[in-house]
Amino acid sequence: MSEKNAYAKSGVDVEAGYEVVERIKKHVARTERAGVMGALGGFGGMFDLSQTGVKEPVLISGTDGVGTKLMLAIKYDKHDTIGQDCVAMCVNDIIAAGAEPLYFLDYVATGKNEPAKLEQVVAGVAEGCVQAGAALIGGETAEMPGMYGEDDYDLAGFAVGVAEKSQIIDGSKVKEGDILLGLASSGIHSNGYSLVRRVFADYTGDEVLPELEGKQLKDVLLEPTRIYVKAALPLIKEELVNGIAHITGGGFIENVPRMFADDLAAEIDEDKVPVLPIFKALEKYGDIKHEEMFEIFNMGVGLMLAVSPENVNRVKELLDEPVYEIGRIIKKADASVVIK
């Protein structure tokens, strides 16, 4: 019995793995950017940092996955956008520290290697990289029968970016009186899906709920996470932003305080938060307490900026989209986030 046949009998299809590599090459090529060295398939991805033109470069990295949103992608057999979610979760974190994304690596683990499906996943990763300006310089696809079911897969990503040392955003510049500006989310993004799946466990996904403005439930639930790089990067370059919070797991309550010192707090005007219909539906059908919604979800604001009052107009000029003045930074009395 040949080694190939022995491996195949154990559930690993080497030929399918080779096919995946061939299928994804055209998608990876879309992400090419200055600084990339070498070709896909090497033992390590290479990047020439000198090509960035940054004088005092500081590398900033992030890693994340998409949680149980993957289970809905599998349930609805829609795999072409979940990769964008993975990229977004990573690059939105590092842009919050002031980094321009340079490159990205992905990791896909599955119970059965299905080349057509995995191509869709990686195509989504590539689309996310294009939106973020990051090169997809490497990755790993692992077929692990026995670890995962045949239809199951998991996805994780790793982003590396660069910032000028003087432009790092670490919360030290946020001060009392700063204005809090919110940038709209595209939907739930990629957190809170264990609760989302429980709320809609008995739904097929084809439903058009009255709150969802004519959209099918499954399309709203799988709406890809917005990538904020192109919106935020010009603001960082002009040093117009004192703090940035990526609103992910933990909602407003956990994420907003991550962008300022312990003696400060955020005062949020709830009436100015552009709450999306899906959050109203979740609160209603899930019988979730209103205040708890802000502890779990982004509620319609995926990125929050702390900006000096004198810079607010310039920030709005640079952002080609609605910008929501949702609050301000105050001295902390008790809670780190006060929603009024």
Swiss-Prot record:
Pathway: Purine metabolism; IMP biosynthesis via de novo pathway; 5-amino-1-(5-phospho-D-ribosyl)imidazole from N(2)-formyl-N(1)-(5-phospho-D-ribosyl)glycinamide: step 2/2. It is an enzyme of class 6 (ligase). One of its GO terms (cellular component) is cytosol. The keyword Electron transport does not apply. One of its GO terms (molecular function) is phosphoribosylformylglycinamidine cyclo-ligase activity. GO terms for biological process: 'de novo' IMP biosynthetic process; adenine biosynthetic process. Its main location: cytoplasm. It catalyses: 2-formamido-N(1)-(5-O-phospho-beta-D-ribosyl)acetamidine + ATP = 5-amino-1-(5-phospho-beta-D-ribosyl)imidazole + ADP + phosphate + H(+). Gene3D superfamilies: PurM-like C-terminal domain, PurM-like, N-terminal domain. The keyword Ligase applies. It is found in: Cytoplasm. Keywords: ATP-binding, Cytoplasm, Ligase, Nucleotide-binding, Purine biosynthesis. Pfam families: AIRS, AIRS_C. Its EC number is 6.3.3.1. Belongs to the AIR synthase family. This is Phosphoribosylformylglycinamidine cyclo-ligase. It comes from Streptococcus agalactiae serotype III (strain NEM316).
